[in-house]
Every structure is written in C-alpha cells, then in structure tokens.
Amino acid sequence: LERLLESLVPGIDVTNEPQRQSCGAPDYVVSRNVIPLGFIEAKNINDDDLEGKKTTGNKEQFVRYRSALNNLIITDYLNFHFYDNGELMTKVCIGTVENGVIVPDNEGIKTFELLFSEFCNYVGQTIKSPQKLALMMAGKAKLLANIINNALISDEENQQNSSLREQMLAFKEILIHDIKPAELADVYAQTITYGL
C-alpha cells in the first residue's frame, strides 16, 4: 500500500508505524516534508465493519479516530472510506474478491486516484472560535490518552521497563500512590495537549 500510494502522488511519504499499532495509532501516516497530511487505518480485506457500526467490531476505535483526525481514510485495501473532520465524504471500491481472486474495478481505481490526490492536498482548517478549538483539542487529548493508556498496559503486561512505565512508577511513589494507568494517561494527554 505504501509504494502504491507514493507512486500516485509525487512528493508524499506514506509511513507504516507497526510499533504504535498496539497503542491505537492509525496504521499509516501520509506526509509531505514531514508534515502530516492525513491518516489511514487499514483493516483486513473484506472487513465487514468498515463503517464502524458494530459495537463488537471497529466502532470504538473508529469513533476515536474520526473525532481526533481531520483527514482520514479507513480501508480494507479494496474499499476506501474518506473522512473529513469526522464526516464520511465518499467511498470508493477498487476491486472485489471473487473465488479467492482479487478482480480490479478500473473505474473505481481511476476514482480512487483522484480522491487520493485530493486527500494529499488537504489543508487544515482555520480555527475561528474558542468552541471549535476546544472541541478539536478535546478530541486530540482523548486519542492521546488512549494511546498512552494502551502503551502503559502493554508495558505492564509484557513487563517492559519503558521510560513511560518508569514515570508511572515514579508518579505513584512521589505524587499519587493509587493512580491507575488510565488516570496517568489522562493527566499526560491533557498536559501535552493543553500545555502547548
């Protein structure tokens, strides 16, 4: 997927970040000159919950991503859902699986090329009100808190001594003795988000 997307729009970089996947980060970051333009969350081919409607499916993750990431694609590698500021703008299918073989949809591929080019030309919106800023920052803080919480839980389960886990232990020892990973994650996320 990385090579395909980079070949469609010269000058962009598509980075897959598998080390952050367990923490809840989107699978791909699309950037130009190290500036993120958008994000892509990829699921398995023929995933039956690309819309994130099933509570036992992708719902919680997709809601979190749509509220925090302004320019987002959710895909199963054949179907691509384009979101702008949390709203589904359009969908396109570039192929189907028939008898275990992927059959390309040439019209869908042409449409996808145009849509992905537009996706890469995304310009962030100007914030014109304190309410809009507060909503955007809150969404980003929630996403960050979830990522930090998942990282802390992963470190604990795998008995890894990351700097984040060490900070959690120091926090417990010095400041709040009964703090839980989710609470520390919330404190960190708010400090990072609103401390900027």
Label every PLM stretch briefly.
Residues 15-21, 133:
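Short, solvent-exposed loop/turn elements at beta->coil junctions and helix N-caps
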